[in-house]
Structure formats: C-alpha cells, structure tokens
Amino acid sequence: MAKDLKFSEDARQAMLRGVDKLANAVKVTIGPKGRNVVLDKDYTTPLITNDGVTIAKEIELEDPYENMGAKLVQEVANKTNEIAGDGTTTATVLAQSMIQEGLKNVTSGANPVGLRQGIDKAVQVAIEALHEISQKVENKNEIAQVGAISAADEEIGRYISEAMDKVGNDGVITIEESNGFNTELEVAEGMQFDRGYQSPYMVTDSDKMIAELERPYILVTDKKISSFQDILPLLEQVVQASRPILIVADEVEGDALTNIVLNRMRGTFTAVAVKAPGFGDRRKAMLEDLAILTGAQVITDDLGLELKDASLDMLGTANKVEVTKDHTTVVDGNGDENNIDARVGQIKAQIEETDSECDKEKLQERVAKLAGGVAVIKVGAASDTELKERKLRIEDALNSTRAAVEEGIVAGGGTALVNIYQKVSEIKAEGDVETGVNIVLKALQAPVRQIAENAGLEGSIIVERLKHAEAGVGFNAATNEWVNMLEEGIVDPTKVTRSALQHAASVAAMFLTTEAVVASIPEPENNEQPGMGGMPGMM
C-alpha cells in the first residue's frame, strides 16, 4: 500500500486537530456538572456514558493524520485506566493542554527536546509534591467518600465500602448485571488466581473479552495436555451433560488447544483452558486447594491417574467461573465444607511453623482464597441503557477506591494539582527547559478550569482564586461553594492523579518531538461493473 508523508509543522497541526476532536468530546464529562456523551452502537441501543476511556475508544477519525493524533490521546486514557482504573478524563484534559501549549512554543521556534526536558523535570517535582500532601485512607467512611465522588453517587460509595469491609482491601469484588431495578451487594464464597484463558477465542463476551461459565465442570490436573485424544472421552461426557468446562492444567497446547478452540467456535461445547497457578511445590498445593474448594480430584501421576480414564465424578463444580486475560475467579465452589475447613486449618498450622515472611504471606493468601469470598455488586436499573452507564460508573469507582487505599488521597476536583503549582514553579531552569516547566504549570490548572466551565462558570476566575486559597480548600462545583475538600469528602486517589499526570506528559512529550508522520493512502474503490459471460465490462 502506498504511503503519504507530512513533515514538521504540517504533521503536528494535522495531528493536533485529531487531539482536539477527541479531547473536546471527552472533557465535557469532567466534574459534578459534566455532561454525558451518546455513543452509537451497531445492532444495539446507543450507550450513554461519562466514562472518558469508553468515549475515547469509540473515536475513529476519517483523516489518517487526525486519527493518529486522536490515537495518541486515546493511549493516555488507556494507560491511565490500566494503571489506576480511573482519571481518564483528567489525563485527557492534561494531555490536550500540554500538547496545545507545547505546539505554540514549537511553532515560535522552541526546541522540542528542551521542552521535553522541562516537562519531565516539572512532572517529577509535581509527583513528589503530590505524595507530600497525600493522606492515608483510614476508615470505612473515607473509602465510601472516594467511591461516591468517582461515581457521583453516595449509594455506590457505600456499596463499595461495605464490599471492601467484608472481603478485605485486597479481596475480590466483581460487578454483575441484576434483573431487577435495585443495586444490591452479595458476598459469595470464591477463589481467584492470576492465570487467564489460553486463547482469546475462548471468550463468551467479546465486548469485555471475558469468559463467563455458569455451573461448569472443573478439571484439575498437573499434566500437560497436548493430545486432544487424551481428553476426548471426558469432553464427550461433558457435552452429554450440556454443561461448560474449565480446564486447569500445567499447559494446554498443540492439537488439544486447537481442537478446543475450533469446537468452541463451532458451538459444539464451551470450554476454557487456563494454566495452573503458581510454580513448583506451590503450584501443586494451589491445585489441591482448588480441587478441595470445587470437590474435584487432582488428575496426577502421583495418584496413578490418567486423563483418558477421567470421568465426571473426578471433576469439580462451581456455580460460576469468570475468566479474563489475566485472572480466573471461581465463585461458589461445591466442595465439601468439612474438607475446606480441614484444609484451612492445615495451612494455618503451616503459617505457625514457618519463619519465612515470604512463605507466610503466600500461605495467608491461600487461606484468604479458601476461607474468604468474592463480593458481588449486582447493578440494577430501569433500562438497559441506564444499566450499562451505571455499571461503568461503579467499575470506575471501585478502581478509584482501590487506588486510594494503595497510595492515599488528595483534595479532589483538580484542587491538588493547583495546590502543587507553587512547588513546581520554584524549579530553576532556563530557555526551552523553563518553557517546558511552564507548559506543565499551565496544564496543572486545566482540570479545575474545565470543571468550572462545565458548571457554567468562568474557569480562569476560579483558578486564580484557588491559587491564593489555603491548602486543601477548593471549589465545590456541585454547590458553587468554596470548602475544605478533604473535610467535605471531595477527594481523588493520589494514584489516579499521579498516573493521569505522568501519562499525559509522556504522550505530550512524544507528540512535540514528532517531525514526520507516515500514513497509508487508501486504495481507490473499483466501481467498474463486471461484464457478462466473461466479456469485458460494458461502457
């Protein structure tokens, strides 16, 4: 395919148009008075959302250069979402500000490399300053406040706080769709381990890229499965029972993996293969834990068992299994309660005997997975459209809350970024490096400015007053009042704010140092009508 090239100013201006189109669509959602964006969905009802990364992912522009600019900002939202799980709109607003301001200076003759050095220096100081003003999340109420601010809903904050209280800060919390109108919290027995499906073709929900299995059989083995013939007799029994199967093995590869995927795609049966968790002796112990939790028998050479001789009564069962790219969660395993209690007691005895802190930690993890549970927030709504929107908000709020527990909280509503303005402005630099620092200084004000504008106010007036306010005092756009943000519970997780700033600066610096852009030229469509009977097309 032929390529088209643009250089220097032409290239950057073309990409900037794409940056602005995407950022302008996303930034209308920021703050308590932010608006929603309606996304067209093929073959289903439109999605109404205020989730930055969801909006960003939907945007595909016709002009290839503009599209590349949009994709760069999309990357900011994606990375921030991956690391912190929230703050994608803030990251987008920061990136747009840095790119716009940086491009003005490059056009005026500034050296992009000098600007990049200044941006990097300013962001480093800003992150240190954020950690200095960060406060630990210490109680259930503070956890609820973080969730409530992220979701703009106090009820959601309360559910997340209760869920974390029941399964622990590091416990497993899943979000499901309810059949009713009300949102409810349930705690189900469950186990999660860090292994995902071995092929993306095993997913049952291609939008979320997850595999959900209802009442599956569970095969637990420490063997490698390479030949499909080894498991064919067992799979035939599973097909007759009309139930899905989760295969947990040392490895599923070759002919076995190929045939599982092919049969899954043909609809013959639903099977998901995952690698066994852990390594060495720990793997063996974790497989035994899983077998006890689900009522399975581990198919292993140690017991003289072969896969081809396995039957349904050797398999475990659970009410539900959810498998993502990286994790497998088994909910409501149907193992014998007495066996589970005995296993927990056995592991606790090992904890008492070991002197190694690392071993203690791993053993405690296993106890939590066997004796702990999975909290399930069941989301209810009056319509499908509202349900999807509410579910996205709860997912963001949960991620935000986890981030807050991990790194603490700072004043919300963009206040913390303006609070560290003074510290960043004290950086000693000259020339283009100083200009790079100033680019970050202007960007630190952008989220507050946009929140105010979304509330129908003049952003620059709010920013100027905030610069001279006491630390922690900020503008509550929901009530149009100046309050102590931390006391009012208007907070942001430090991790979310930090990630947004880091990723925005990284992409902005790459953008400003771009000197050439290469785009594919689309092939012209052939509109010529085919001739009849092998004859050339008629004029």
UniProtKB/Swiss-Prot annotation:
Q: Which UniProt key words apply to this protein?
A: ATP-binding, Chaperone, Cytoplasm, Isomerase, Nucleotide-binding, Stress response
**What's any one GO cellular component for it?**
cytoplasm
Question: Which EC numbers does the record give?
Answer: 5.6.1.7
A GO molecular function term, named singly, is: unfolded protein binding
| Compartment(s) of residence | Cytoplasm
Q: Name one GO biological process term.
A: protein refolding
What is known about its subunit structure? Forms a cylinder of 14 subunits composed of two heptameric rings stacked back-to-back. Interacts with the co-chaperonin GroES.
The record's function comment reads: Together with its co-chaperonin GroES, plays an essential role in assisting protein folding. The GroEL-GroES system forms a nano-cage that allows encapsulation of the non-native substrate proteins and provides a physical environment optimized to promote and accelerate protein folding.
Q: What is this protein called?
A: Chaperonin GroEL
Q: Which organism is it from?
A: Staphylococcus epidermidis
